[in-house]
């Protein structure tokens, strides 16, 4: 429903029946005044009851105005909750200036404002994914008295690690997200009488330019598209802090795990790029939350999903069908969770489910577990080996259960002008793409095991210990774990990247000595997959994953300042002296 300009200017609450659900009444643009006087606006979905009810709050920078009239908000309201959806500071209908992820104080103030609304019974839960997961966690870390429970989907534990993975910049999201925010900021500045409640994003032409021009532009800190420096200065703030420092500390959720006092249900997918953050938040809060009840009532579910909220019809990613069991009604789980904590059942005790539920790919079935990572998983090593030419899947790269004889090195050339493509369009979604086209590239080293005699169950974080040298003073190394079927189909499972200068940690960059073999420990991410009998375990090694990550220009210059790039000659070592190895968390069967 669109509001007239006068209603927008005055912030007048407007009431309407929901066309999608006549039992739900929608109240538009209720005003909440923050501690500094800035007014934020929210829409409220009222259930069909005159009674005071518990409330569920979502705070979003993407417009509180739903794109789908039959949205989650209506379902939650129909389940007996007052649903409050607020535009975050400086976005859409809310006043003020947006500072991305600076949501702790506003989150606290909004929770307490919601609890005091005359139609709310004083109990508040929070829900939402991605940025809206951040708004929950940062608010909860401030301990608002009336906050009872959380349902964060796809969350980060460290904003730095969300922006820089292994020191490499998440280019597709970092640039694409900020350009999307700039569109709203530009409209607010140039069209003050426009309908600010309507969601807005990049135009088709702007999306094309993002893919074909803007993400290729160098230097990174000279981007002028959409007057980005004026309308989304946060992009340049990120570029100015390529190492973890006090700028990032104020957004660090992991450092606040000991402050959490409420139960939380953490949801993510094996192909969500925020998977690692969600796993870390679950484990950290379960171990360190401030109360015993909060520690006991952290829950985790991980399915064969991407960055989007799963539904009962979510069973495919691309060409891979995970079967009927993969479909999952996350909204029903959310209703169950909040009914327990906000509907009176909490008095009966803890939430009645195992702490962890995982979808195990390969066998495509759900499994309940007691912890993450799994205590019974055993670190198992596969050694890299070759006869000196592991380039492409047709090469002679091998993964061996024991240190194997053979040539001590493989080499490839990394040219930033022709990077290895990410292969998927989503900035924060990966996919089980068939890798065979990429494995034909000479700049991709491919190491494969022999066909397995029995199933191999891998559940947990995967690590590559890589001995490598480079002709450059700084470069990147990438790793990807792949499940290869007997017919040759090569399904990507998880991947990682490390910028060489950050091999010693995210606070201490150190350039390479060209040509000197150096040990790199690459976090390849987590997975849950059974490699079936007859399948092969495969590892791909290269130096780029573009445009998900920026291209390392190989110069060793300060980050984001290079206007030109150089080619690097890369050498991967595998010998007794330099034992490159893939470390898998294998679960005994």
Give the location of each predicted region.
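N-terminal cap/lid segment of alpha/beta-hydrolase-fold proteins
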Residues: 18-51, 448-454
């Amino acid at each position: 429903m669109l509001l007239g300009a006068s209603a927008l200017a005055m912030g007048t609450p407007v009431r309407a029946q929901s066309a999608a659900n006549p039992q739900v009444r929608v109240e538009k643009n209720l005003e909440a005044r923050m501690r500094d006087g800035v007014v934020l606006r929210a829409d409220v979905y009222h259930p069909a009851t005159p009674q005071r009810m518990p409330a569920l709050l979502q705070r979003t920078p993407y417009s509180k105005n739903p794109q789908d009239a039959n949205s989650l908000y209506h379902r939650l309201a129909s389940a007996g909750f007052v649903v409050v959806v607020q535009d975050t500071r400086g976005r859409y209908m809310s006043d003020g200036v947006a500072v991305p992820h600076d949501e702790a104080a506003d989150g606290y103030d909004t929770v307490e404002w919601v609890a005091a609304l005359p139609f709310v019974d004083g109990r508040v839960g929070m829900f939402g994914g991605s940025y809206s997961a951040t708004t929950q966690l940062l608010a909860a870390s401030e301990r608002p008295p009336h906050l009872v429970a959380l349902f964060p989907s796809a969350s980060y534990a460290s904003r730095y690690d969300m922006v820089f993975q292994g020191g490499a910049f998440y280019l597709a999201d970092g640039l694409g997200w900020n350009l999307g925010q700039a569109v709203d900021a530009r409209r607010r500045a140039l069209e003050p009488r426009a309908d600010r409640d309507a969601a807005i994003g990049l135009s088709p032409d702007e999306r094309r330019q993002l893919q074909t021009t803007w993400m290729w532009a160098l230097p990174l800190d000279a981007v002028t598209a959409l007057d980005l420096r004026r309308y989304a200065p946060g992009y340049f703030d990120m570029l100015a802090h390529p190492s973890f420092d006090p700028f990032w500390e104020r957004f660090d959720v992991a450092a606040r795990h000991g402050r959490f006092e409420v139960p939380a249900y953490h949801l993510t997918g094996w192909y969500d790029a925020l998977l690692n953050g969600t796993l870390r938040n679950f484990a950290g809060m379960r171990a360190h939350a401030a109360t015993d009840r909060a520690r006991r009532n952290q829950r985790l579910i991980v399915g064969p999903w991407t960055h989007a909220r799963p539904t009962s019809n979510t069973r495919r990613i691309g060409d891979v069908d995970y079967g009927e069991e993969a479909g999952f009604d996350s909204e029903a789980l959310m209703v169950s969770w909040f009914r327990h904590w906000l509907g009176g059942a909490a008095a009966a005790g803890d939430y009645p489910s195992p702490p962890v539920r995982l979808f195990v790919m390969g066998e495509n079935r759900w499994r309940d577990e007691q912890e993450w990572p799994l205590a019974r998983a055993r670190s198992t090593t596969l050694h890299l080996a070759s006869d000196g030419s592991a380039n492409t899947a047709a090469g002679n790269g091998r993964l061996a259960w024991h240190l194997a004889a053979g040539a001590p090195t493989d080499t490839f050339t990394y040219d930033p002008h022709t990077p290895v493509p990410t292969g998927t369009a989503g900035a924060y979604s990966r996919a089980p793409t068939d890798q065979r086209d990429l494995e034909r590239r000479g700049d991709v080293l491919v190491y494969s095991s022999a066909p397995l005699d029995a199933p191999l169950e891998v559940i947990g974080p995967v690590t590559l210990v890589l001995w490598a040298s480079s002709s450059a003073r700084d470069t990147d190394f990438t790793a990807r774990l792949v499940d290869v079927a007997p017919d040759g189909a090569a399904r990507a499972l998880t991947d990682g990247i490390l910028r060489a200068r950050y091999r010693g940690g995210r606070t201490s960059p150190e350039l390479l000595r060209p040509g000197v073999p150096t040990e790199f420990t690459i976090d390849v991410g987590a997975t849950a997959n059974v490699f079936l009998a007859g399948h092969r375990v495969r590892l791909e090694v290269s130096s780029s994953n573009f445009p998900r990550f920026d291209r390392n220009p190989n110069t060793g210059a300060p980050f984001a300042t290079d206007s030109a790039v150089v080619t690097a000659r890369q050498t991967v070592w595998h010998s007794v002296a330099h034992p490159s190895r893939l470390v898998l968390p294998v679960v005994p069967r």
